[in-house]
Amino acid sequence: MNSGVCLCVLMAVLAAGALTQPVPPADPAGSGLQRAEEAPRRQLRVSQRTDGESRAHLGALLARYIQQARKAPSGRMSIVKNLQNLDPSHRISDRDYMGWMDFGRRSAEEYEYPS
């Protein structure tokens, strides 16, 4: 479930980044003003190129993450397999503890009920 949330957040960030494009000025006044604006525009173009590269890198990372998430075993069986890999002296190797209560019910062997 955490991977799904992370995936949604990552997609939202990428979408927000793609939607925030610079707006061109309505009407530049004079050639002196145009020259003054050209330098920041050049810097903006360079930064947009690096942003595009980082977006491509993020896209590649996202594709690898999705691929790994599909390959990874999930659910109860993967947990059981991981527990089977524990060494036999580990405390939870067999998942059967002394005094374990199943959903709040005690086992019938522990208590004698009056008849």
Swiss-Prot record:
PTM statement from Swiss-Prot or TrEMBL: The precursor is cleaved by proteases to produce a number of active cholecystokinins.
Residue numbers of Phenylalanine amide PTMs: F103
Cross-referenced Pfam families: Gastrin
Keyword Repeat: no
Residues the record marks as carrying a glycan: S31
UniProt keyword annotation of Secreted present: yes
Known function: This peptide hormone induces gall bladder contraction and the release of pancreatic enzymes in the gut. Its function in the brain is not clear. Binding to CCK-A receptors stimulates amylase release from the pancreas, binding to CCK-B receptors stimulates gastric acid secretion.
Listed name of the protein: Cholecystokinin
Organism: Homo sapiens
